[in-house]
């Protein structure tokens, strides 16, 4: 394990904590895409099915459990405790547009044609596009709260750091995971415009706004 991997995990965890604290303190899930959070819960579920069969390290096991629990707590807060504040009118991204191609690709491009491996591959592909409903929701409403933008920033930073992790591992171990790297690059690309707006607006105290779709 290297500093990029650890930093990426910390950034990922910070993003989730920021999101949960935002909802808990405001008693609202306004501005948060429940569909994106459902996809992330599905990502962690299908990726960590080996939780009780494969042991790599205590750190690895603990982080898996933390991400799983946080994902389902987030979904519960949105669709359960704070469901009255859920903005379903603007959270309208069609999930089948993501799930159908991701499922198909998981069967076509994987390292081993076994249930666990296909589900792991599915989770990697799905994570690369899981944020799209949230970005679509922001573009539809035209703006995002500062806390939501901080959440997205750390989520994007996590992916950038994981790309650095793969580069470092290739340099030091000659290890290359094509599926993870390509999916990570795709996911990072989705954040480029957001990173630019975050740096030029949010960090200067301005509200992030996006052009509304025609």
UniProtKB/Swiss-Prot annotation:
Site note Interaction with the K-D-E-L motif on target proteins, residues: 5, 117
Region (Important for recycling of cargo proteins with the sequence motif K-D-E-L from the Golgi to the endoplasmic reticulum): 204-207
Alphabetical list of PROSITE patterns matching this protein: ER_LUMEN_RECEPTOR_1, ER_LUMEN_RECEPTOR_2
Membrane topology: Multi-pass membrane protein
MF terms (GO), sorted A to Z: KDEL sequence binding
Family, per entry: Belongs to the ERD2 family.
PANTHER family listed in its UniProt record: ER LUMEN PROTEIN RETAINING RECEPTOR
Entry domain remark: Binds the C-terminal sequence motif K-D-E-L in a hydrophilic cavity between the transmembrane domains. This triggers a conformation change that exposes a Lys-rich patch on the cytosolic surface of the protein. This patch mediates recycling from the Golgi to the endoplasmic reticulum, probably via COPI vesicles.
Protein name: ER lumen protein-retaining receptor 3
């Amino acid at each position: 394990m290297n500093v990029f991997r650890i930093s990426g995990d910390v950034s990922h965890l910070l993003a989730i904590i920021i999101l949960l604290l935002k909802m808990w303190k405001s008693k609202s899930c306004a501005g948060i895409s429940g569909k994106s959070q459902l996809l992330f819960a599905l990502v962690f579920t299908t990726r960590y099915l080996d939780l009780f069969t494969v042991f790599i390290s205590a750190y690895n096991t603990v982080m898996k459990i933390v991400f799983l629990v946080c994902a389902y707590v987030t979904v519960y807060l949105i669709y359960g405790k704070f469901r009255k504040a859920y903005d379903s009118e603007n959270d309208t991204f069609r999930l089948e547009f993501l799930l159908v191609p991701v499922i198909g690709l998981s069967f076509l491009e994987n390292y081993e044609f076994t249930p666990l491996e296909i589900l792991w591959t599915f989770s990697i592909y799905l994570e690369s596009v899981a944020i799209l409903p949230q970005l679509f929701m922001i573009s539809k409403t035209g703006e995002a709260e500062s806390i939501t933008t901080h959440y997205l920033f750390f989520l994007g930073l996590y992916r950038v750091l994981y790309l650095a992790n793969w580069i470092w591992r290739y340099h030091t171990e000659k290890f290359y995971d094509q599926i993870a790297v390509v999916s990570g690059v795709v996911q990072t690309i989705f954040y480029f415009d957001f990173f630019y707006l975050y740096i030029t607006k949010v960090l200067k105290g301005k509200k992030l706004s996006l052009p509304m779709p025609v």
